[in-house]
Amino acid sequence: MVTIEVNNATSKLIGYLHQDPAVNAQLHEAVRQELSYEVPSAEWSQKYKQGQWDGRISLYNKRITTFPSGLVRRVRQLFEKLEIEHQIVDIREKPERNYPITCDFEGKDLRFYQENAATLAKKTQRGMLSLCTGAGKTMTSCKIFENLAVAPVVFIVPAIELLKQTQKEFQRYLRFNGEKIEVGIAGGGLCKLNMEGINVITYQTALIAFDKKYLEKGNKVVDDPNGDGPKSTAQLQKELEEANKNLIIANNNATRDLSKLSLDLENANMLSDKETDLKKKKTLASAALNLEKQFNKEKNTLIKTDLAAYKKALTAWDNRQETLLQKSQVRNLISSCNAFIVDEAHVASVVIEELGKQAKNAYYRLGLSGTPWRMDNQEIRIEGTLGRKIIEVSASDLIELGFLVPPKIFVCNVSENNGGETYPDIYSNNIVNNWERNYRIKQFAEGFKEAGRPTLILVERREHGDILEGMIEDAVFVPGGDKGVDDPTDEEKNYRRRMLNAVENNEIVLIATQWANVGVDAPKIATLILPGSNQSSVTTYQQVGRVLRCVGPNIEVSKQNNKPDAIIIDFMLEQKNLKSHCNMR
């Protein structure tokens, strides 16, 4: 009989799957296949063409017979299917309920599915909660915290825009002994953790703490030797020691060069001290003071360059020590947390996988997402870290229940069809610089604004936003990313919020880039125009979710607030690639 030994992060097969070595090897291969996924476009790989690779990546390590614990259910079902005798031994330590917090939703009642989600989270201990935009993930998360009652908790968010917003909402609803709690935060230059409570951390900050970084282009996590900065800590220490040495030498040289002035100052002080006549004493003291000022001025001039170099080196060293301290605090928090929860868990599966490995002590592992699937087949990585989907609440469910407004989706055909030798040329000619398409966007945007419908336009390229801003009356283009590579400053975040308020008041037509795809709280926006040509169903669901929120608790109140529905405008072109993208959306 084989034993499945379950731990928080990884599980292990102990014993033989079969006494016959050949059959045993075949069964291990079956486990490898069961815990694998097909790599898109693998058929173009040389190893695949040469028969050296089957085009799949497995999460099962055959050499040491381990796999992510979120996949135990798959292994158990496989063993039952193959009639392999097995037992499950759970060696995890369940944490004590050491953080009895409560929720104060300010008179609001949780919806039934939010209660169910929070109950299932505690019961299953790990899993994905598929809650669409508008389902109330923040309040659901707070109820989960109350049900689990453990600390510390790490709550991962994918972008800097969500960091303070999430912290603020948690502090708004959570109570300890009747008082509002202090929620820890790390990211965007902030690091104020609560080792005995709940903490919100960006995944970029969490990765940096372990000297890792995420490469979006290759969709992988790699070591980051320069995570602390372009210079190593040893190099900064050497520079500080050298600067200190040079400053000492400069001080000695200045003292030597100013020896005569120093002697004059010493004599002047001596004469002043000995003088008994008050009037003469005052005159001598004034002369001594002037000599002291002259001495200090000339000395500062002589050591100015070396002093500045020392201060610069000391500041760099102090900053590095602060960075190392903060990284250590984040590492300790993640390594010791009792609950590891990821918001927007679909964003980067390899990041979740890496951080899940580091959260070795996390008994509870949960993910929240409105779109818990990926275009690259890597959902199994998310499942391995966080577990299978335990509840699903779709936009259709909430529309039927009256918690979201119904969408009206229109696809506008564009007859202008321009060629191009490469895809960037095709995109530029048919999307960015397509006069017919852009003019129709202008007509739609201005018409909806005039009709009193706050309108959002989501572009994929900055140059496209610039063009549309110049064409559309009252349009304001607010560019920016969403991956945390170039985190917005507080001023930029405040500007975005002001522009969101302006579009909600129908003062402007807002044109935005991917920063507005997720985490934007602007329920009054009633119209969405999609001028780009993305082919990701995940992105499309996120974008459409921006305009489905009710203005108020339900559709009836939303109708009273002049938002009975949401209108989404998309475009269809006859160019082969772009037409395919539209069909996928």
Walk through the language-model features, giving the residues of each.
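Post-DEXD/H (motif II) to motif III coupling segment of the RecA-like Helicase ATP-binding lobe
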Residues: H346-P407
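SF2 helicase catalytic motif II
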Residues: T205, K220-D223, K238, T323-G367
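Conserved interdomain hinge at the start of the Helicase C-terminal
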Residues: T422-E460, I467
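A conserved SF2-helicase RecA2
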Residues: I391-V405, R549, P553-R585
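Conserved Walker A/P-loop ATP-binding site and its immediately adjacent core
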Residues: N147-R172, R462
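Conserved RecA-like helicase motor core of SF1/SF2 enzymes
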Residues: A516-I555, E574
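Conserved helicase ATPase core of P-loop NTP-dependent helicases/translocases
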Residues: V476-Q514
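Walker A/P-loop
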Residues: T124-F145
